A protein has these predicted regions:
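Short, charged/polar surface micro-motifs in flexible loops or helix N-caps
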Residues: 47-48, 61, 90-91, 97-98
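Short coil-to-beta-strand transition motifs
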Residues: 22-25, 82-88
Length: 140
């Protein structure tokens, strides 16, 4: 989500949600597995730092990207930030609900606010992502 983690730490709120059943990237994206597909979104920490999200652009549907590559941008009232894939693969779907109402990301970041679905190239990349406890250490 954002490469400048150190700048975010000073603004961390203690009530952020980090579900234990998800994996996380150091760029502040979360990932959950549904079969051979990864569902990806930004973390509660990321959305809290961005503020009110007004537009999400994912021009990469149908493309195959490597883990760590930019798959889209997230525009908030105060900034625009790149979104990075935590796992590589083909982007098979962009969340139409987020396209219609980007504020869903702020309201339900781990549910209806998911961003993309990716058919993973290498499922082992998922295993290499951060656990909830490790992600909490990163942001805390």
């Amino acid at each position: 989500m954002h490469r400048k983690t150190a700048n975010f730490k000073s603004n961390l709120k203690n009530n952020l949600n980090v579900p234990a059943n998800l994996k996380y990237s150091s760029d502040h994206e979360w990932c959950r597995i549904e079969g051979d597909t990864a569902v990806i979104g930004i973390t509660d920490f990321a959305q809290s730092q961005l503020g009110d999200i007004v537009f999400v652009d994912v021009p990469t549907v149908g493309e195959t990207l490597a883990a760590g590559e930019v798959f889209g941008t997230i525009e908030a009232v105060k900034t625009v930030s790149d979104a990075f894939l935590p796992v590589g693969g083909e982007i098979v779907e962009f969340n139409d609900a987020v396209d219609a109402d980007p504020s869903i990301v702020n309201k339900d970041v781990y549910g209806e606010g998911w961003l993309v679905k990716v058919k993973m190239s290498d499922p082992a990349e998922y295993d290499a992502l951060l656990s909830a406890a490790d992600y909490e250490k990163l942001i805390g």
